[in-house]
C-alpha cells in the first residue's frame, strides 16, 4: 500500500522544488513511471483535463502544470479542494473537481499577470524605478500571490523586490532577493517599522502598519549595501 503513495511523494518533491539528487531522484523517477499509468481517479482526471493523456509525464509537467493546479486551491481558496480530488473515488466527481482546480489555476495565472503588469507600471513610471530595493505596494493584490509577483519583478530588474498588499490587519508582503543582498539581515535593520517578519537571505515575509510603508521603503534604500 505504501508504494501507491509514490506518485504523491514525487509530486510533492518536485512541487516543493527539492533537489533531485540521491533518494529524491529515485523517488521522482519511480513516481513519474507510476503516474503515467495511475489508477487514482483524481490524478487521472487532472492529467486528462490538462491534455497530458498519452504523453510522457516529466518533472516539468509536475512543476509547471499539475503541481500549480493542486497548489492554486491553497493559494486562492482552501487546500481541501485539492485533497478532495486526490481522495476522490468516482470518475465523474473527479472530472468535475479537476476542472474546478484547472479553472482556479487559470484564474491565479491571470491575477498574477495583472499584478506583475501593475508592478512594472509603478517601477517604470514613478520614482520607484530609481530605488535599489524595490518596495511595491499593490493594495488589491491577493496576498498569496505577492511572493510570485516579487519573484517576477526581481527577475526582470535584477534587484531585491518586496510586494506588499492589504491584509486583514495592516499590510502584508513577501520579498525575493538577489545573491548580493541578504534580505533577512536588512529586514532586521528595519524591525522597528515592522509588526513581524521572517525569512532567509533570498526571501522573506513581513507585515507592517499601512502608515509605515513609505518609511520602510526609504529605510531599506538608505541602508542598501548594493
Residue ranges of predicted features:
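Hydrophobic helix-and-loop "lid/oligomerization" segment in the mid-to-C-terminal part
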Residues: 2-211, 215-218
Amino acid at each position: 500500500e505504501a508504494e501507491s503513495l509514490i506518485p504523491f511523494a514525487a509530486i510533492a518533491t518536485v512541487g516543493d522544488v527539492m533537489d533531485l539528487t540521491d533518494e529524491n531522484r529515485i523517488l521522482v523517477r519511480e513516481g513519474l513511471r507510476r503516474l503515467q499509468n495511475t489508477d487514482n481517479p483524481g490524478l487521472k482526471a487532472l492529467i486528462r483535463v490538462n491534455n497530458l493523456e498519452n504523453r510522457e509525464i516529466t518533472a516539468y509537467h509536475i512543476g509547471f502544470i499539475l503541481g500549480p493546479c493542486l497548489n492554486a486551491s491553497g493559494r486562492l481558496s482552501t487546500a481541501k479542494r485539492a485533497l478532495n480530488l486526490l481522495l476522490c473515488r468516482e470518475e465523474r466527481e473527479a472530472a468535475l473537481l479537476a476542472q474546478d482546480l484547472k479553472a482556479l489555476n487559470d484564474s491565479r495565472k491571470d491575477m498574477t499577470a495583472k499584478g506583475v503588469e501593475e508592478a512594472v507600471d509603478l517601477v517604470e513610471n514613478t520614482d520607484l524605478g530609481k530605488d535599489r530595493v524595490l518596495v511595491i505596494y499593490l493594495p488589491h493584490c491577493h496576498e498569496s500571490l505577492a511572493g510570485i509577483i516579487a519573484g517576477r519583478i526581481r527577475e526582470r530588474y535584477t534587484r531585491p523586490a518586496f510586494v506588499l498588499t492589504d491584509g486583514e490587519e495592516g499590510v502584508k508582503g513577501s520579498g525575493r532577493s538577489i545573491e548580493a543582498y541578504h534580505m533577512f539581515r536588512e529586514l532586521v535593520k528595519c524591525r522597528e517599522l515592522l509588526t513581524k517578519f521572517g525569512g532567509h537571505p533570498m526571501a522573506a515575509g513581513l507585515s507592517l502598519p499601512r502608515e509605515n510603508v513609505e518609511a520602510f521603503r526609504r529605510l531599506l534604500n538608505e541602508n542598501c549595501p548594493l
